[in-house]
């Protein structure tokens, strides 16, 4: 919800949608022993004109999350992906690569404004946790997404990380203001701008 408000504050657009890509842990539907990532994504989309205050958006976000992250929706997406992979496995790589580049260039990560990934509460054995000051994880930056945000909580400290390709600080500043307004004690750490 705060990301929608910060996203609106960070854009000059007056129309269109803010869309946040949220990973869904597929292990809750298909138990797996692997430590490899097993997730799919759903998109929570709200028109910019409807992003006004937190209470008015909570019901809409919950409704979309419930519908789009449901087992039925994830199975449908997984089945579609599997069918596409099975169909494309017979197409030569020399044909697939240029087509994939064109499709990614046309859509790519432009269909989402931001990404949010939450590892949740991480617990460690006391023999290890006493040596850990804090914990974080950072998503890689995307070519066009405004920001990739990640959250992890360890030892009652929640770390919210933002990775992005732009130097415009309006998204982070709005997130800071919103958290402060909610009475959350915020400590900000950052890295210097990296220019290639």
Predicted segment positions?
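Membrane-embedded hairpin module used as a gating/binding unit in multi-pass transport
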Residues: 4-5
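Acyl-thioester-dependent acyl-group transfer interface
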Residues: 8-196
